[in-house]
Curated annotation (Swiss-Prot):
One of its GO terms (cellular component) is cortical actin cytoskeleton. This is Claudin-5. The chain crosses the membrane at residues 8-28, 82-102, 124-144, 161-181. Residues 217-218 are annotated as: Interactions with TJP1, TJP2 and TJP3. The gene is Cldn5. Interacts with MPDZ. Directly interacts with TJP1/ZO-1, TJP2/ZO-2 and TJP3/ZO-3. The keyword Nucleus does not apply. Its main location: other. Keywords: Cell junction, Cell membrane, Membrane, Tight junction, Transmembrane, Transmembrane helix. Plays a major role in tight junction-specific obliteration of the intercellular space, through calcium-independent cell-adhesion activity. GO terms for biological process: calcium-independent cell-cell adhesion via plasma membrane cell-adhesion molecules; cell-cell adhesion; establishment of blood-retinal barrier; maintenance of blood-brain barrier; myelination; negative regulation of angiogenesis; negative regulation of cell migration; negative regulation of gene expression. It is a multi-pass membrane protein. One of its GO terms (molecular function) is structural molecule activity. InterPro entries: Claudin, Claudin5, Claudin_CS, PMP22/EMP/MP20/Claudin.
Amino acid sequence: MGSAALEILGLVLCLVGWVGLILACGLPMWQVTAFLDHNIVTAQTTWKGLWMSCVVQSTGHMQCKVYESVLALSAEVQAARALTVGAVLLALVALFVTLTGAQCTTCVAPGPVKARVALTGGALYAVCGLLALVPLCWFANIVVREFYDPTVPVSQKYELGAALYIGWAASALLMCGGGLVCCGAWVCTGRPEFSFPVKYSAPRRPTANGDYDKKNYV
């Protein structure tokens, strides 16, 4: 596969991952009510996200409420907000950088400089994926720990929501796509090729009697 095709494929994966990360950030499904034993007949389900919480009735009616106070939020929610939004914005910067250095655009003249710009964009996408993984894994760890904590009431136990799985898939796409962009750009960075020096021997000189000197023969 050519370097340009690698860059395009990587950019497509990064764009899909970016959209998935935006969905994960906005969906109020980072944790959902855990249905355990005696509360399985409950008439409502609670969803909680980074920006709002929703209550879904058994009739299908859903009511959501946006978090009004930032200071009243837990530390993990505040950190997840900051890191996820930061990853989304960094991915936007990576998009412009990658498009500037991509072989399919003419923003920069073809050459090593253009390839290094694309390489930087791919690296930024990979960093976005890693940055998004931090709040996702941190939040999931808290949900799992509280689920198995016997001191937490059953009514307050939650399970992993769909937004976490979407976020993990988006992070994987961002890192894989960033890696493909870097691979495609690395081919065009103008790095020196490995070669072996070629030695040339001087032509043999004839002697006075017209014969070649014996020392010229090996």
